[in-house]
């Protein structure tokens, strides 16, 4: 499976665009648009707990898509373990632009960092004798993002999709018999792993 997940700029752009569309449909941010358009502010993104930071490029992309003139300066790297009250990024630009993008940026950052942080806690508890693996039980269309977060937290990615390996489970066995399932898997193996649960 993929040992290092690389999220392309276009992938990140597309996901952020969907999130902004969801947040701003149909009339934009009517409250933030009440602010004076020229007021420039600087905001600090501070982590409120010890965490593994992940999803900074999603957060940055939210601000950039709302206003290309917003400056988002990343102070930590994705996968960094940060202490409580650490400065993660600074944002400078028009107040209304920053407030329009803020929630989408924070939602991505909180969700992805939350998965990475929780994974890291489990990895530390498990020690070196076992691996913490993630499954396909992910939010539809966000699997790559969630598996990226697990990887940053020190976890291991299991199957990305149904074609990665043969995984014969109780539901398969209930619909057939284990002997024929395993026999057919061996015939069609084509270099894929076969697992029976």
Task: Kindly label every feature range from the protein language model.
Residues 1-197:
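Acidic/glycine-rich phosphate/pyrophosphate-binding loops and surrounding catalytic core
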């Amino acid at each position: 499976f993929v040992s290092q997940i690389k999220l392309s700029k276009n992938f990140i752009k597309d996901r952020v665009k969907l999130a902004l569309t969801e947040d701003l449909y149909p009339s934009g941010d009517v409250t933030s648009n009440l602010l004076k358009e020229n007021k420039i502010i600087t905001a600090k993104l501070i982590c409120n707990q010890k965490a593994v930071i992940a999803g900074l490029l999603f957060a940055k992309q939210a601000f950039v898509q709302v206003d290309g003139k917003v400056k988002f300066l990343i102070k930590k790297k994705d996968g960094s373990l940060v202490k409580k009250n650490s400065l993660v990024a600074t944002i400078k630009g028009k107040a209304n632009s920053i407030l329009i993008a803020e929630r989408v940026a924070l939602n991505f950052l909180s969700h992805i960092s939350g998965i990475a942080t929780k994974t890291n806690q489990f990895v530390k508890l498990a020690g070196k004798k076992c691996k913490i693996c993630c499954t396909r039980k992910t939010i539809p269309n966000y699997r790559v993002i969630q598996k990226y977060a697990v990887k940053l937290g020190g976890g291991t990615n299991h199957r990305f999709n149904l074609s990665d390996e043969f995984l014969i489970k109780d539901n398969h066995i209930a619909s057939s018999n284990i002997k024929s399932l395993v026999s057919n898997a061996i015939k069609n193996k084509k270099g894929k792993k076969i697992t029976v649960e």
